[in-house]
Curated annotation (Swiss-Prot):
The keyword Isomerase applies. This is Diels-Alderase pvhB. InterPro entries: DA_C (IPR054499). Pathway: Secondary metabolite biosynthesis. Belongs to the Diels-Alderase family. It is an enzyme of class 5 (isomerase). Its EC number is 5.5.1.-. Diels-Alderase; part of the gene cluster that mediates the biosynthesis of varicidin A, an antifungal natural product containing a cis-octahydrodecalin core. The PKS module of pvhA together with the enoylreductase pvhC catalyze the formation of the polyketide unit which is then conjugated to L-isoleucine by the condensation domain of the NRPS module. Activity of the Dieckmann cyclase domain (RED) of pvhA results in release of an acyclic tetramate. The cytochrome P450 monooxygenase pvhE then catalyzes the oxidation of the C21 methyl group to a to carboxylate group. The lineage of its organism: Eukaryota, Fungi, Dikarya, Ascomycota, Pezizomycotina. Pfam families: DA_C (PF22903), DA_N (PF24137).
Amino acid sequence: MGNKMTKRISHFNIENAIIPGEVSASAHVPGENNIFPKYSSNINDRTWEIWCCEGINHEGAGVMFGFQRAAFNKKMGGGWRVQIIAVWPDGKNWYKALALPESIFEESMASGDITSVWKTADNSTNVSFTYHKVDNKIDVVVCIPGVATGKASFQGQPGDSGLSTSPSLGPYVSYMRPVGRADMTSDMIFHFPDDGTTRQISFSDGHGGFDRYWGEKLWLSIQSESYFMRAFLGPYVIQIIRLVSTEELGKQQWPIARLFHQGKLVCAPQRCGSPDEQGISQDTLVMSKVHDSDTGALSAEFHDKSTGYDLTFVEAGNARRRWTFTVRHQTKIWSLPIGPKGGNSGFVEHVCGGLAGETCEGLGVSGQIVY
């Protein structure tokens, strides 16, 4: 008998990992982290996967990381896309998109730990993340000499994980939060080539999380806009991802929203509703854009000039509790145009609310795309 497999590997090289024809994603496993690639051997020109994490501290300093395997990566830059973003409390921000030819995942079948490295052929530039299963922790390490270096860690908080809930973000995308609520530390240095200066983001009091998602159709073919946010305020943690489908697909709203209170998952909407809706039989998210720049909130720089959202989480069942929150754009993190009118905007969000009579306050990180 042969040796038992000690690890499984997914090694993507930009030159040969993209193939014609059909490819199938491996199945989602309820209750598990599902971090290892679902398309572990190849992707085609439609399928893709993303892993991302972000966090900020109470002052509004934060870092964000994105890792992507998609066919357009080869067309756009000749390598798998890695994004690193930083923001400081004074509004200064930093952005870098890398195109790296190799993306490697290794999972230990004994420990369940997963390490992913995105790198150049000679390994002179590399960005990696490691999931420590026993500790429920993600470590991100950046080694881009003369550009950015350092480490950020996301330690999962105790309590409900939400991993047993559905990952379906509409019919074509699966979305999960393997370490969805985390205490975060950062020790990163960023270089600014324009003036030759460097800035540090070093803290041990941040909050954030690590998400991953995968899909079988191109973003542009299924969505007209999207909004992502994770926020920590008092005893609450809010997690939202919502897609709005294209005109051809009926402008449907596809959300995966989660509300935690003191570590317990109290509301898990998989649908959006209207403020006056009656007879709600499922947890529901009511989400309304606002345009109140007179309050000092920022607006996006593209054709959608919203300054934030009003949110209501509605619990199904006899209790039918309602939690309401205001979300307002406080600090711009990034702003990237998409096409003639659309764009991708990121913000530090000021979030306030709770149950009736509560005024919990805190900060979050959001990303908003409009086409």
